[in-house]
Amino acid sequence: KVGGDINGGVGNIYDGNLVELAVSPRFFVSRKVEIGGSYRVTHLTFPERANRSTTEFTSHLGQFRGQYAFDKKATFSAFIQYSNVAEQVGANFRFRYNFSEGRDFFLVINEQSYTNRDPVETGLPRLPLMQSGSVLLKYTHTFIY
């Protein structure tokens, strides 16, 4: 099964204009596997001003999502995002195990990485590959009273 969305828009932002287009496909590979993503391009234009160095700018945002259900109790999901504005790639991986209704265990791994580490281009000292990362263990229990 295949699904998705296509969206676009034209509008104003502060004293400028914006044109945007987004495509978001989804694929249901099987009962257990779903993959999808989105790509959004936004073009901004602004009038020239004395204190403004850029009058045009294009932003690209790409996202990937995937989910796998091992069975009714265990699932794995992944979310990866790229932004040319931030010059970073972010990733989130999550494993969830549902012991019973209201009792869940999560293992979550997050990572944020730089895509442009060149000191000549950035004007900064060489950036590390990884900007931040975390590993989280979470247990939830809903009390019924």
Residues covered by each model-derived region:
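Repeated loop/turn-to-beta-strand initiation elements of outer-membrane beta-barrel proteins
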Residues: 1-6, 32-37, 73-76, 102-105
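Long hydrophobic segments that form regular secondary structure
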Residues: 1-33
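Transmembrane beta-strands of outer-membrane beta-barrel pores
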Residues: 8-14, 41-45, 80-86, 97-99, ...
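Hydrophobic, lipid-facing positions within transmembrane beta-strands of outer-membrane proteins
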Residues: 19-25, 60-66, 89-93, 133-139
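Surface-exposed extracellular loop regions of Gram-negative outer-membrane beta-barrel proteins
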Residues: 24-28, 32-44, 48, 56-75
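Outer-membrane beta-barrel proteins
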Residues: 29-31, 70-72, 84, 99-101, ...
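Outer-membrane beta-barrel "beta-signal"
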Residues: 93-109, 114, 126-145
